[in-house]
Amino acid sequence: VSIRVGVNGFGRIGRNFWRAVAASGKDIEIVAVNDLTDNATLAHLLKYDSILGRLPYEVKATSDEITVDGKAIKVFAERDPGKLPWGDLGVDVVVESTGLFTDATKAKVHAENGAKKVIISAPAKNEDVTIVMGVNEKSYDPSSHTIISNASCTTNCLAPMAKVLHDTFTIEKGLMTTIHAYTQDQNLQDGPHKDLRRARAAALNVVPTSTGAAKAIGLVLPELKGKLDGFAMRVPIPTGSATDLTVDVSREVTVEEVNAAVKAAAEGPLKGILSYTEDEIVSSDIVTDPASCIFDAGLTKVIGNQVKVVGWYDNEWGYSNRLADLIQLVGRDL
């Protein structure tokens, strides 16, 4: 039986998630979407995508549905998520991807309306648990975890690398920088924004800004709580990012040891989440790669017990694939 999913917010992540489910063949059925945009526009943006290209299916919009390849998705335009009839639609899991309801005290309205589980596609507040697939999914408890955060795309890239380094060499402390594609939260032209750096034209600047990814690591790897920090440099590309992590470990190591540890994890317990390459790639090469982290072995640097590693990630596509994986995980025990 398919896991029935409702999506609240059909923006970049909502639409990427729809495409990731369609491409993966996972037993997930998206039965309803809520978005304040009109249906014709939503259908058009699902069919035509500047990064992912054109959907090879017929996409039609009616007043209350979008039909893709003959399959209907119910569409609502409710400003108040408390009015969404998830229970009546038999929705098992709601993906909360508006960016507006990242506080579980607000997101729980989906569960009150009949959804069995709610997954917030962002770092959250007051959530029951934050899960990064491949890192701490074993801590998921179906009996007590209803509102679940899938963390951020950057935490999903950072955590697998940090886990391997910590499990193998013991991280003492570290700093990270994500060289990150621009997002909807930046301005196309200079204009007002609460973050004066993000106020500036996204396609014309390297824009330093905050990321909670390093601090959030403690939510999924508790032994690293308070040991990592960092920031983001937003760069003028639409997707395809890289996390640069520098850590002090408990003993002196070599580049070969570090790369061997990551390669073993990528071919073993973290297969599909962490991938390993020795190719000399650039950001466009990892667009539409479903892994959370593509470890670039050629960039590993070591001085004594200090280690620098780099992992690439398609911040939209990789993350959307993890949403689908997390839904499969929670769908086992509904």
Each PLM stretch: what is its role?
Residues 144-145, 201-203, 240-244, 306-308:
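Short, solvent-exposed beta-strand edge segments and adjacent coil->beta transition regions
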Residues 22-26, 163-171, 181-184, 211, ...:
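Generic secondary-structure signature for well-ordered alpha-helical cores
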Residues 230, 242, 246-334:
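C-terminal active-site/capping subdomain that shapes the small-molecule cofactor and substrate pocket
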Residues 66, 131-133, 147, 188-189, ...:
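Short clusters of hydrophobic/aromatic residues that line enzyme substrate/ligand-binding pockets
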Residues 167, 171-238:
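Acidic, glycine-rich segments within the central catalytic cores of soluble metabolic enzymes
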Residues 1-199, 301, 325, 332-334:
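N-terminal Rossmann-like NAD(P) cofactor-binding subdomain of oxidoreductases
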Residues 151-152, 206-208, 248, 313:
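Hydrophobic alpha-helical scaffolding
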